[in-house]
C-alpha cells in the first residue's frame, strides 16, 4: 500500500478522501493483525461528499468492493459522478489494486427480494478467510458479496456457543453462521432459506470447510411457514 503523500493532480476533495483512507488504514492496522482479520470495511461515507463504502477482501489476492450510496435528488448528478470517479481512482492507487480486482456498485434503498436480485451472470467466486473458516464470495453478480462483514462478531458468538447443541439458522443466506456453528462443535445444523441459489451457496461453503452429511441439513422453505409446520417437533439449543 502506498504511503500518504500530497498528490498535486488530486482535487482538494480527492486529497481529503485519500488522507482519510490512509488514516483509517493506520487506525485499523493493529486491530486487523491482532484479530487475524482479512475482510473488513475500510471506509463508510466518513466524508459526506464521498458517500461510498469501501470493503477490502484479502486472500491470495486483494479485492476491493466499493458501493456508492445513491445521491439524493438535490445533489448535482455530474458532481456526484466526478466524486465517485475520484474515489475509485484514489482507492485503487492507495491499495494498489488493478482494475479487474475492484468492483463498483450503487446501493439504492430496496426492500424484499429486490435487495437479493441477481445483477450479473459471471459466476466467478473467490475464497476468503474469516475466523479460521473459508467462505466463497461473489463480487459481480449480486449487490452483496455473500459475506456480511458487519456480522463478524455475531458469527463468532455462534461458534463459541454451538458446542454440543443443535443449531437452527433461519434466513440462512449463504450459511456463514452455519459454518461457524459446525466448526464450533454443533451436534447438528439446520439452515432454512427460500432461495435455492443461496442454499446451494451455503452447501458449497460447508463443503469448503469439510462439513456435510445428514447432521447438516439445508432446507429450502419459507422460514415462518417452516416454523409453523415444525412447531414442537424439534428443540434447538441455539437459534
Segments (PLM) and residue ranges:
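Non-catalytic accessory regions of SAM-dependent methyltransferases
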Residues: 1-69
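Non-catalytic substrate-recognition/targeting regions of SAM-dependent transferases
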Residues: 53-55, 82-148, 156
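Conserved acidic residues
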Residues: 100, 165, 187, 237-238
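Conserved class I S-adenosyl-L-methionine
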Residues: 164-173
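Conserved SAM-binding loop of SAM-dependent methyltransferases across substrates and taxa
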Residues: 174-187
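S-adenosyl-L-methionine
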Residues: 195-238
